[in-house]
Amino acid sequence: PKRRTKGQIAIEAGLAPLADQLLDNPTLDPDITANDFINPEKGIEDRKAALDGAKFILMERFAEDAKLLAKLRGMLQRNGHIESKVITGKEKDGAKYQDYFEHSEALSHIPSHRALAMLRARNEGIISLTINPNPSLEDGNAECVRIIADHYKLDVLASPWLKQVAQWTWKIKLALPLENEFLAKIREVAEQGAIDVFAKNLNDLLMAAPAGAKTI
């Protein structure tokens, strides 16, 4: 049987209405609102347990929101950079990859050959690769959290707890899966690009005049 998520367990414990109330009314005080949901019989011993359950429900809901995911993917495609950093102690072994010991390049413009070289270096344990959502900002991840907050209309008056749920959602639920998704896409596009270049070169070779022959 499929393992139940923390959010599903919280829903079974009756905490979905708490999650809904806090999201629908962002200025509510979470601690006061959670008092009505304490239920030791269902394992909700105190306010913290109630709010933890509501947090898991909202995080899973946010992470499965197709419209939100489309906004985040669009932002990463426009502004994201792939960044590489040499793994300490691998400088000598990976000397041929030294161009990528500390490198940053826009996801939307990276050439196939460079993407493949960076992925190869990572697979050989020479460098680490990460996606920076927006390197023009001091904290690129903050842009993703802002998109989540804006999507659910969490403005300056929203409770700090709700804003933290947006942060947790990005950090725990979305950052790594989206990074892996983009790295896989880069590999797919780069490999196809390399195949296309190879095919074109091969075609040019086949269409060329035989060696030693003179075209008239």
Q: Could you describe each region identified by the protein language model?
A:
Residues 1-215:
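Duplex nucleic acid-engaging cores and interfaces of nucleic-acid transaction enzymes
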